[in-house]
Amino acid sequence: MPANLSSALETFKQQRDAAEAHYLKANRVSVFFREYTAAVETLLAALWAEYFQNSALCLMAVGGFGRGELYPCSDVDLAVVSPAPLSDGIQEQIARFVQTLWDCKLMPSVKSGSVDELCESVRNDITGDTAFLEARFLFGNRQTVDKLAEKMNAQRNVAAFVEAKLVEMEHRHAKSQGSGAVLEPNIKSCPGGLRDIHTLLWIAKAQGLATDLPDLLKQRILTRAEAGMLSHGYRRLAHIRIHLHLNAKRAEDRLLFDLQPQVAESMGYEGLNLRRQSEELMRVFYRAIKTVKQLGGILTPMLQSRVSSTPLRVTLRIDDDYIQVNNQIAARHTDIFFRRPEHIFKIVEIMQQRNDITALEPQTLRAWWGATRKINRSFYQNPENRRRFAGFFRNGNGLTQTLRFLNLYGVLGRYLPAWEKIIGLLQHDLFHIYPVDDHILTVVRNVRRLALDMHSHELPYASALMQSFEKQDILYLAAFFHDIAKGRGGDHAIQGIADARQFAADHFLTGEESDLLAWLVENHLLMSAVAQKEDIQDPSVLDAFCKRVQTHERLSALYLLTISDIRGTNPKLWNAWRASLLESLFHAAGRYLTGNGGNPHTLFGRRRQEAADLLTRAAVPEKQQKKLWNALGSAYFARHQSREILWHAANLVHDFETPIVRSRILPKSDSFQVMVFMPNGPRLFARLCRIFSRHGFDILAARAFITEHDYILDTFIVQIPSQHAPEDYPDIQSALEAELNSFIHGHTVAETQSRSRRISRRSRYMPIAPSITITPEEDYPDWYSVEITAVNRPFLLADMAEVFFAHNVSLRYAKISTLDERAEDSFTVFSPDLKNPKIQSSLKQTLLEQLS
């Protein structure tokens, strides 16, 4: 590199470092952009003089560089423009210029060509056209730049450009779905992100409007309040993106888990632990993108309407205050929301009741939103407003859209102060992926979908149950309030009771409705916990559950709410296995509440008789049956459900001395049920778990049983890895059975190291503290319940089984609840030694070492 360029590069580095240092001290986005852009332009001036002095070419800044919004590690978007087609020599010179930019550690993105070539290249390229929309002259022949701008503006179809940018935004938003996009959002491309702000400004500029907020204010595109809010939201997002680049030291626009604490700390969230810093950062982020989405709802249709060819304007009278304009509702006088605040809810009520109205007309929305900021205690105390708000739930029609609309524009938080506290609140528990307010509204949506025929195919049984449920509005309210007390510290289910009861009293619910609502809020985790963590074949478990539930109405409501809650927490959580657990508990509890539960001895006898009837029909002699029952022992019928007993009996009755493996694909699921029968021996359960983990199976449930003649009869439910299609299941089943058969006949299977597969980035940087509780079983000496919560990982169950074995603890039952990256496992174990506090403490400590 020539000496003069080396000097220019050194000057650039000094100016860049000074811009970053000044920013970190003064924290002003606009100053950083100005200083860093100037540093890059100074370097470009030296390079241009070196390569293109006195040439007919010109250099333009385009894209983000063109608008003066250059982030620390962003591409430097440039265009080299020639009045005539480029010769081979000029193209080689441009290539050397670009290579020097790379050598200077910039990230150049360079277009080159003649005026005609560049115009043609963007004719059908919306991205390229957008980049040139923000072009500005840097060096060279200015007349060439003017000619290019004139020609591009002349060929641009403004209406088509606007429509294409809006379609592009829709596609961008559609890609920002799923847990990764929610938990580690792309600050540039997510809904409400920086690219949405750019899109608004591009649409304005294409129409010949200004692209800076003060000028848009003068042109009456924005109100003063909107300009202030958009500017504030933009600065928030720009601050985060600058810090993100500085901490990542690369062009990283995703708020990755490992970067969230670093960004939060560098932005000044001090005095908090890493998790709280990250949560506070993400809460600021979610509120910023919410502001952008709010303004987009007003400005996008307003700007679009200026250029789009719309259908014939059809205006219909609704009442003295409102008219319908095509599919929108408009106020005759937009000051009505200030003069008569009860209309803040009335217009929403009309929109909810009318399927032919899908939105508020932009000017009406602007006025309505302005008035909502005046919602206060007096507004809440107005009985008319309370009736209308409760009516949103009683009506049900369009409930999800109504609540999301009210949440987007801040009405829910102003009307209900408890709601304000959960807006944008993240939960780093390794299974929730949405902020609390979004999660709640997703659960409301799920409950509402169960009530609609059009969605009955998703969950036919639950849908039929919901459609016959009399108090649907109370279920909607239970979904709305179930997590409203999150983030306060303590048990949110208990704390939410007071919020639910206060709402019920203020909104004219009957005492019976209030009781059901409060009970559902308090117990919304009950059914999920029992179904996923406890042995519902144990009559004492069912008895305790039903004593809490007491009525069929509560049971049905809790079942529907639980399904909707799990499905609204994380798409990965809902599967056929979890559905079958809840349905089994629901039906078992229903029989119990009807009086058909029977006492334990009757239940066990019925299970044995059902199996005996099956074997008799298969012509198995009664003498042979008795031998099997004696080998299994009476405890067997207390620990297994009827379907398992029938399956085991059919496979074991003719020979219960020879080891066998059997498996079956569970109907309508991606899971196998596997039984392993073989002579008892050391570490068998742990070694079996390792085989499943090595094949990539998730163990959903496991039951370890030792027969009277010292054989193990272990039954597993394992989930097939998601990358496999159903047509692959038989081959997977055969391969698994082959390895298990080899194992039970004494052939050594290679042991696999427990930590051979890495845990996720989320688990590494946002871990949960492992917890262990050991509780003696009532009425069963030497039996204990062990509850473990930890980060999920491969071989976790096998490792815990090894610890149990090392401490002379016999594992008899395991219920595995895998909540995405969080494991909540329940074990029933037998050990006379655990009466000794030292041994119990040693077991806990060793388990914690495995889990940490």
UniProtKB/Swiss-Prot annotation:
Positions of region (Uridylyltransferase): 1-318
Any matching Pfam family: GlnD_UR_UTase
Parts forming coiled coils: none
Domain of life: Bacteria
Annotated function: Modifies, by uridylylation and deuridylylation, the PII regulatory proteins (GlnB and homologs), in response to the nitrogen status of the cell that GlnD senses through the glutamine level. Under low glutamine levels, catalyzes the conversion of the PII proteins and UTP to PII-UMP and PPi, while under higher glutamine levels, GlnD hydrolyzes PII-UMP to PII and UMP (deuridylylation). Thus, controls uridylylation state and activity of the PII proteins, and plays an important role in the regulation of nitrogen assimilation and metabolism.
Domain HD: 436-558
Protein name: Bifunctional uridylyltransferase/uridylyl-removing enzyme
